[in-house]
């Protein structure tokens, strides 16, 4: 029986072989008798990621919810985040994941190749993009139950042209493809498409996709980030510094916010407060 738990620490290849010699099996929290999976999550530097969304807080929140879904899956032994961003590296470690440092940003496929070299050959590989805020451990488990049966497999994105997750069994030489037409490329290369829940299909790289993710249901980190960055309507209740009461009756002070096209703010004036830009504008 395994005596170690990989839920907390993801051990490298050498340690994995040592465990095999000591215990007769890889030590992991995965279910007995099934493939043990190593999760990989590529993460762009925050200043380069999701420019169409324009909020670093959301990018980090997406990553947190994605990594957490993998870490809490009963089928995933450990998770590594591949990134050149030191802040995201620290974030990954704070979640209990391992960080694989990308020396310089060289593109998604290069980052994945770097990460795949760290996966012990006796383990399967599951790759999830870092922008899956709706993903849950149940979704991951369901995908891997099917991935157990195929050399390589994948889940397409909501638009039906790309991919959100991909997996290959131990000893497989299959390679992943993400981005435009990756669904077709995966199928052409023999990967099996696995049907998933709307949560597993929904990646987020545009405001429209974010709206759809909110409709489906996002994870707790993304929900908190949205609450902290979504513009709200309020009524000015104090001046110098600006105070305002939101629609729930809570009053807050905004000393470092900039008034936009409001030359002489007045108590009782209706405004929109945007935490993302720290702007206060007249309510429309």
Language-model features, listed with the residues they occupy:
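N-terminal nucleotide-binding beta1-loop-alpha1 segment
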Residues: 7-14, 26-53, 235
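Flexible glycine-rich surface loops and low-complexity tracts that mediate binding to linear polymers
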Residues: 267-283
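Short phosphate-binding loop-to-helix
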Residues: 91-126, 182-185
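Short, glycine-/small-residue-rich phosphate/pyrophosphate-handling segment
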Residues: 164-190
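Structural detector for short beta-strands of small beta-barrel domains
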Residues: 231-238
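A short, N-terminal amphipathic alpha-helix
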Residues: 59-76
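Conserved donor-nucleotide/metal-binding helix-loop-beta segment in metal-dependent transferases, i.e.
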Residues: 138-158
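Beta-strand/loop nucleic-acid-binding surfaces
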Residues: 250-264
